[in-house]
From Swiss-Prot:
Protein name: 4-hydroxy-tetrahydrodipicolinate synthase
Keywords assigned: Amino-acid biosynthesis, Cytoplasm, Diaminopimelate biosynthesis, Lyase, Lysine biosynthesis, Schiff base
Record-annotated active site: Y133, K161
UniProt-annotated binding residues for pyruvate: T45, I203
Organism: Idiomarina loihiensis (strain ATCC BAA-735 / DSM 15497 / L2-TR)
Subcellular locations according to the entry: Cytoplasm
Length: 296
């Protein structure tokens, strides 16, 4: 299912900097048990920019195998080089992923014509659906609703992860792209309002640490149960805010380490949180009763 409660999963590393496949298996099992609808593998939260292409493909292959059909795996296939994005797409299609999350090419700021050509090339490389990913805070390119309308004409482009936090875009995207075009929030603090406005789910960082609770929030919001959704989101708000006190995925990986789920290992240029933020993260987790819950 490429909608609902989708986790943007971290990529765990050993102290030597290698991918920790044992911890990865633990995380995949956690999300299957919690009812998470899909996992995004090797996206922004998965530190995709510090993995080699070989590692990127290996992690996706492992997730498909570990999931064993229990949960959909959506692979990050974005790059600011179209040829590299196409190569990743071809390899991960062979792995058996359910679809792709394809971020706008970053740094080189292509025109609309360049974007169309880029996404068409990726579409030609697979028979799997693609979800566009708009995160201008990282890419310096805002994929506006009028641009999305043009990209949605590509056959296997079925939706967008909209990470601007601008809930007003939901209605405009629906009007331009139709009700069947999947709209996913990419911003945890505004995801509830995004779904109230007509969105179809969220690709969530917070779901890494509270997968079952995020599933409850999404289920309530999509069902129109505003009272329950508001109550759940109020409980989650301190977590939403804490997870972005530094660049994602620094706080979420530190949180998972304090919970006993993964080791607190990053790849440069990412480093552990500043000491003051380490204390903040621990305090928020303690108040939420999330410290040292490895077997819960």
């Amino acid at each position: 299912m490429l909608k609902g409660s989708i986790v943007a999963l971290v990529t765990p590393f050993t102290k030597y900097g290698n991918v920790d496949y044992s911890e990865l298996e633990f995380l995949v099992n956690k999300h299957c048990e919690a009812g998470t609808d899909a996992i995004v593998a090797v996206g922004t939260t998965g530190e995709s920019t510090t993995l080699t292409h070989e590692e990127h493909i290996a992690v996706v292959n492992a997730m498909v195998e570990l999931s064993a059909g229990r949960i959909d795996i959506i692979a990050g296939n974005g790059s600011n080089s179209t040829s590299e994005a196409v190569q990743l797409t071809e390899k991960m299609t062979q792995a058996g992923v359910s679809g792709f999350l394809n971020v706008t090419p970053y740094y080189n700021k292509p025109s609309l014509a360049g974007l169309i050509a880029h996404y068409q090339a990726c579409a030609d490389a697979t028979d799997k659906p693609q979800i566009l990913y708009n995160v201008p805070g990282r890419t310096s390119l805002d994929m506006t609703p009028d641009m999305v309308e043009q990209l949605a004409k590509i056959d296997n482009v079925i939706g967008i992860k909209e990470a601007t936090g601008d809930v007003s875009r939901v209605q405009e995207l629906k009007e331009r792209c139709g009700d069947d075009f999947i709209l996913l929030s990419g911003d945890d603090p505004t995801a509830r309002e995004f779904m109230f406005a007509g969105g179809h789910g969220v690709i969530s960082v917070t779901a890494n640490i509270v997968p079952a609770k995020m599933k409850e929030l999404v289920t309530a919001a999509l069902a129109g149960d505003k009272e329950s959704a508001n109550q759940i989101d109020a409980e989650l708000a301190p977590l939403h805010n804490m997870l972005f006190v530094e660049s994602n995925p620094i706080p979420v990986k530190w949180s998972l380490a304090l919970m006993g789920w993964v080791s607190a290992n990053y790849r440069l240029p990412l480093t552990p949180p500043e000491e003051s933020n380490q204390q903040l993260i621990e305090s928020v987790l303690q108040k939420a009763n999330l410290l040292n819950i490895q077997e819960s």
